[in-house]
From Swiss-Prot:
It comes from the Bacteria. The lineage of its organism: Bacteria, Pseudomonadati, Pseudomonadota, Gammaproteobacteria, Pasteurellales. GO terms for molecular function: arginine-tRNA ligase activity; ATP binding; glycine-tRNA ligase activity. Signal peptide: none annotated. Belongs to the class-II aminoacyl-tRNA synthetase family. This is Glycine--tRNA ligase beta subunit. The keyword NAD does not apply. It holds the Pfam family DALR_1. GO terms for cellular component: cytosol. It catalyses: tRNA(Gly) + glycine + ATP = glycyl-tRNA(Gly) + AMP + diphosphate. Tetramer of two alpha and two beta subunits. InterPro entries: DALR_anticod-bd, Gly-tRNA-synth_bsu, Gly-tRNA-synth_heterodimer. GO terms for biological process: arginyl-tRNA aminoacylation; glycyl-tRNA aminoacylation. The keyword Ligase applies.
Length: 689
């Protein structure tokens, strides 16, 4: 089998930097899927992405599809011909589908009789005849939320396309993609190297682009250069570069030939909270801040240029000139905001609507204040501090700094509270109220901050569900899924003794008559328990374990988590499968009984040795496990219950549950009911697969 390397490069105008990597990897995945569907063998698919191009290179691609032998079995001979020996309609229809006549069909003898069969050899098509359509379909299936047209063309893509190159080895695959004819022209860097050049062979890519066009097409190579050079530059200044993965990817997507440089800003700006300076450096300018070894911001930053002049001074001075007004703005806002206390901004919250039916931000603030105090009391936090933090929680939204730099909400509240002389725990809570902001983010450190964070999240959940605006599909404008998961993480990971239903009831009362959904408590609790399913599945917990616990609907998250861990452990035991089956059998037996089932076992009615053994062990475990259940120590409880496997098996082997004697029957049902209730103290084990 002969192979060649294949190249597909799509030259465009500047692609969206935040989407570039996703587009490139999706392009490669789509091509790989298409090749597999076409039956074409290959070694691997490489992807390349730069601001003005997407490309894939398929290594060692077979130059043709394999030849295939097909065999299509038709109707039995007995059903293929009528009494006169003429083909039946079934036979003719089958033959027509195979592209032959009935007379051309072969016959296949089997143990079950003789059948019509069509055998054929299908020659594989040359790969060069397939790749145009494969690339076209791969591009059409890219995750592009918003397409655009350009010029007088009807074709649509994420950005205007200027060049297309499809090469199988050295052979140009002709045709059009997105209205552009495939050719050998590759465009280089806008300012460095050759503007355009010709590529003769797929093997030349991407090196020829680097050598002639001054473009590093390999996204990961550019990324590695930026990361290494940035770390080296920061180290030379005695600091450490703050390089987040998302920002690094975005910067990598903005440059074709990275040149890492450092610049400075005036030290007077360091009097402004570092978060505000960093916000504008990262968010607006795509710079990397530099910190000293103690985590203090240095008056330097790193930026990445797309050109590499002999003298970089003008570029450095240009970037310093651009960032200076933004830092000056932050300085002005900070100094202006400090002229009034946070508490003085409370009345202005009355002018901002949280939600039309739920009132203003001042209304929300008062609810948070009250609920934070309730939660603080339950978890052993300082109630007065929690209420104070709740009262001030949204005041920084009225400051100039947060109005201009929205992502500094919370953290600026902390700085302003410190300036006002507020208690440190209160000040920190103003920042930590939004934690966790995203998956994997840190949780609030103190119980006071946890109280405020939970109060804020529960207020939003209760309010929005209370007016009947639960998330639908992927739409979640109030980020309720994030709020629910964040609240669960705080309660579980800090092992807080909180009950979801109780908190939602207290939250509901604070809305007075604003809520219209009478089932708001159940709706919020069910929604939050549903978020547990996604959380545990991400952790690799089996779905049936989660379902087994959900069936009991425990509304204390820490308790829910303890049950999940216990059942997950139980599932690994040798006896788990048999006990799950036994629980299912018990459940089915009890489900058929009409009326109330007693759990009172009468020892005088125990006739068979096997039922005596089970009854005695069940009764003993009732007393033994009660303290474990009370303390939420579910794993040792299930370990003890796992020891019942043999005695349960013996019971079902030797004892007739549905005895004719009513008293015997009811007593045996009571044994099973007591047994099942012991397991149900943890979860519905019958749901384990």
């Amino acid at each position: 089998m002969t192979t060649q390397n294949f190249l597909a490069e799509i030259g465009t105008e500047e692609l969206p930097p935040k989407a570039l990597k996703k587009l490139a990897t999706a392009f490669a995945e789509n091509v790989e899927n298409e090749l597999n569907q076409a039956g074409l063998t290959f070694e691997k698919v490489q992807w390349f992405a730069a601001p003005r191009r997407l490309a894939v290179k398929v290594l060692n691609l077979a130059t043709s599809q394999p030849t295939k032998e097909i065999e299509k079995r038709g109707p039995a001979v007995s059903a293929a011909f009528d009494a006169e020996g003429k083909p039946t309609k079934a036979a003719e229809g089958w033959a027509r589908g195979c592209g032959i006549t009935v007379e051309q069909a072969e016959r296949l003898a089997t143990d079950k009789g003789e059948w019509l069969v069509h055998r054929a050899t299908i020659e594989g098509q040359p790969t060069k005849n397939l790749m145009l359509d494969i690339v076209t379909r791969s591009l059409a299936n890219l995750p592009i939320p918003k397409m655009m047209r350009w010029g007088d063309k009807t074709e649509q893509f994420v950005r205007p396309v200027h060049t297309v190159s499809l090469l199988l080895g050295g052979e140009l695959i002709e045709g059009e993609i997105l209205g552009i004819a495939s050719g050998r022209t590759i465009r280089g860097h806008r300012f460095l190297g050759e503007a355009e050049f010709q590529i003769a062979h797929a093997d030349e890519y991407p090196q020829i682009l680097k050598d002639k066009g001054s473009v590093i097409a390999d996204f990961n190579e550019r990324r590695a250069i930026i990361l290494a050079d940035s770390q080296a530059k920061a180290s030379a200044l005695g600091g450490v570069a703050d390089i987040e993965d998302d920002l690094l990817d975005e910067v990598t997507s903005l440059v074709e030939f990275p040149n890492v440089l450092t610049a400075t800003f005036e030290e007077r700006f360091l009097a402004v909270p570092a978060e505000a300076l960093v916000y504008t450096m990262k968010g607006d300018q795509k710079y990397f801040p530099i910190y000293d070894k103690n985590g203090k911001l240095l008056p330097h930053f790193i930026f990445v240029s797309n050109i590499n002049p002999t003298d970089p001074t003008p570029i450095i001075e240009g970037n310093e000139k651009v960032v200076r007004p933004r830092l000056s703005d932050a300085e002005f806002f900070f100094n202006t905001d400090k002229k009034q206390r946070l508490e003085d901004l409370l009345p202005r919250l009355e002018t901002v609507l949280f939600q039309q039916q739920l009132g203003t931000l001042l209304d929300k603030t008062k609810r948070i204040q009250a609920l934070a105090g309730e939660i603080a009391t339950q978890i052993g936090a300082d109630k007065a501090k929690a209420e104070r933090a709740g009262l001030l929680s949204k005041c920084d939204l009225m400051t100039n700094m947060v109005f201009e730099f929205t992502d500094t909400q919370g953290v600026m509240g902390m700085h302003y509270a410190r300036h006002d002389g507020e208690d440190e725990e209160v000040a920190v809570a103003l920042n930590e109220q939004y934690m966790p902001r995203f998956a994997g983010d840190n949780l609030p450190n103190s119980l006071v901050a946890s109280s405020v964070a939970l109060a804020d999240k529960f207020d939003t959940l209760t309010g929005i569900f209370g007016i009947g605006q639960a998330p639908k599909g992927s739409a979640d404008p109030f980020a309720l899924r994030r709020a629910a998961l964040g609240a669960l993480r705080i309660i579980v990971e800090k092992n807080l003794p909180l009950d979801l239903a109780e908190i939602v009831k207290k939250s509901t009362a604070l809305f007075a008559d604003r809520l219209t959904n009478q089932n708001v408590v159940d709706d919020v609790v069910d929604f939050m328990l549903g978020r547990f399913r996604a959380w545990y599945q991400d952790e690799g917990i089996a779905v049936d374990v989660i379902q087994a616990v959900l069936a009991r609907r425990p509304t204390k998250p820490a308790d829910f988590d303890a049950r999940v861990r216990a059942v997950s452990h139980f599932r690994t035991l040798d006896s788990a499968e048999a006990l799950a089956a036994a629980n299912k059998r018990v459940s089915n037996i009890l489900a058929k009984i009409e009326g109330e089932i007693s759990s009172k076992i009468d020892r005088t009615l125990l006739l068979e040795p096997e039922e005596k053994a089970l009854a005695e062990q069940v009764l003993a475990l009732q007393s033994e496990l009660a303290p474990l259940f009370a303390k939420g120590e579910y794993q040792p409880a299930l370990d003890r219950l796992a020891g019942l496997r043999e005695v349960i098996d013996n019971f079902f082997d030797k004892v007739m549950v549905n005895a004719e004697d009513e008293k015997l029957r009811q007593n045996r049902q009571a044994i099973l009911n007591t047994l099942r209730n012991l397991f149900l103290q943890v979860a519905d084990i019958s749901l384990l697969q």
